[in-house]
Amino acid sequence: MRQAFGVDHTRSSSVRLRFAALLALVAASLIGPGSRSEAKGREQKTAGLPSTDELPGFQQTTPLWAWADFCNRHRSECASDAADPSVVRLTKATWDTINAVNRHVNATIKPLSDQDHWGMVDRWDLPEDGYGDCEDYQLLKRKMLAEKGLPRRAMRMTVVIDDKREGHAVLMVRTDRGDFILDNKTNFVLGWNQTSYTFVKREGDDGASWVSLGGVIPPFATANR
């Protein structure tokens, strides 16, 4: 009787093991493909999207007088909601929108210095009459992108020194794939470290304050000087 009972017990354990293995296979067939599909979906959403480095800011610094003057005249353009994200999640749709706005503004606005336009050395404004200096291009891009749903906190007006050693303004869009530059000098949206510029300062998190960028020179620019 003990021997017969032992045989039955062994068979019972074997059956339970086979049943557990079967359940594991069924679970894998139900869950595995879904997980793989989700992972594949995430890869497809970011496939072909560029990535670059983040450009960190340093201590607070004084905003440009022309920026403060612009904000006094266009308060809604400088308003910043602390609840908004300071970084954009980059998707193909968002990337396409950023590039389309950059190209559109570059093609639409005609260059005109502030001195010729306003009789002033430096004035920041929206180019409502179709003419503008570098900063005016970027302010319009910023406005258009905000209207398309990008948070203003993730779009920073930025002051650089260009390859002619002159002051220049660009728009930096901060994303989860790095910081990208919109520029009236090119239709290509580049990572900040792919430009030839020296980065001086940019808007801070709250719109009113600015932060120093420490005169950072991208490796690309250093190699070409």
Where do the language-model regions lie?
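Generic secretory/membrane-interface signal
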Residues: 2-3, 29, 75, 177
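Sec-dependent N-terminal signal peptides
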Residues: 18-24
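A structural boundary/capping signal
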Residues: 36-225
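Helix-centric, low-specificity signal for extended rod-like, repetitive segments
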Residues: 9-11, 29, 134
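N-terminal secretory signal peptides that target proteins for export/translocation
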Residues: 1-15
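C-terminal segment of classical bacterial N-terminal signal peptides
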Residues: 29-36
